[in-house]
């Protein structure tokens, strides 16, 4: 991954059309109703698109809301741990799942190529391919 895919960092990418990389979020890539709503509201309130910190915070909030619904509001640590292990939930990126073995949030990634669009002050990550979470062999390194 190229790292640093926050909007201010993408300004420098405008110098590198055709550069390829990977990201876990760019507001124009996920095609789902949750992302559409978040992007629309973010533009309305802030007059700019959300970056991956916004999507990450939104995803964390969705995880908590989903867990509390599934636990009937029981917010005790042990109940939430059991509830969230293996739990899937909707996010701006699409479905995420907490892997039971190590609590890793398994999520899709995006292979992109930078294109230049005069409407944006930054190099635009254009989707080449969505890499499904199931395709990635993320090791489990804990001894649980």
What is the predicted function of each stretch?
Residues 1-144:
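Extracytosolic ligand-binding ectodomains
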């Amino acid at each position: 991954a190229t790292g640093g895919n926050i909007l201010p960092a993408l300004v420098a990418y405008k110098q590198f059309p055709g550069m390829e990389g990977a990201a876990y979020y760019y507001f124009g890539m996920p095609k789902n109703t949750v992302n559409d709503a978040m992007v629309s509201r973010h533009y309305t309130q802030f007059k700019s698109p959300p970056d991956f910190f916004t999507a990450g915070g939104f995803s964390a909030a969705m995880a908590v809301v989903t867990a509390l619904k599934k636990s009937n509001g029981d917010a005790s640590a042990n109940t939430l741990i059991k509830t969230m292990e293996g739990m899937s939930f909707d996010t701006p990126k699409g479905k995420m799942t907490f892997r039971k073995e190590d609590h890793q949030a398994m999520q899709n990634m995006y292979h992109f190529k930078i294109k230049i669009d005069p409407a944006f002050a930054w190099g635009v990550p254009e989707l080449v391919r969505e890499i499904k979470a199931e395709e990635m062999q993320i090791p489990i390194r804990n001894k649980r």
